[in-house]
Amino acid sequence: MSSGNAKIGYPAPNFKATAVMPDGQFRDICLSEYRGKYVVFFFYPLDFTFVCPTEIIAFSDRAEEFKKLNCQVIGASVDSHFCHLAWINTPKKQGGLGPMNIPLVSDPKRTIAQDYGVLKADEGISFRGLFIIDDKGILRQITINDLPVGRSVDEILRLVQAFQFTDKHGEVCPAGWKPGSDTIKPDVQKSKEYFSKQK
């Protein structure tokens, strides 16, 4: 795994790359064009594999939930945009993706994967890296899974909601926090309000 330039609390590495857009067209996109929105940027190893379609379809199927949070989901792999399109055009029952509601970025030179520290150099593919970037372009969360285990869309939604809550209210979110749950005031005395309610 490469060390990369992605660091929590710092601007996420910008990129410009060709993506297959939800309308099936090719378009060059930049991370910077999403400034003002949260971004969930995730890498997956390869098109036409086994765990990858389950993750990508899960994110695509719930793209509207992210959109309601002013959050754009973007997927990326080292495959060409032509390969992405072929996979999208392959029926789900044959291991394909079917129509997508999120852009899929092509990183054939592996520069984006390297920049984000997810390149598995010995195989020339990406680990399952996921990055939550806030509306100011600051990297707020990083997870990197080894190849055989997929990610939870529910957990990513929860994290976006939690970061947005802390941005807006200045309170912090305890373990397992969900919208509507109690939060903690980050103050020695005021935090006792939360802890006094615990069993």
Curated annotation (Swiss-Prot):
It is found in: Cytoplasm. The modification Phosphothreonine is found at residue 90. Residues 6-165 form the Thioredoxin domain. There is a cross-link at residue 185 (Glycyl lysine isopeptide (Lys-Gly) (interchain with G-Cter in SUMO1)). Its EC number is 1.11.1.24. GO terms for cellular component: cytosol. One of its GO terms (biological process) is removal of superoxide radicals. Its main location: cytoplasm. This is Peroxiredoxin-1. The gene is PRDX1.
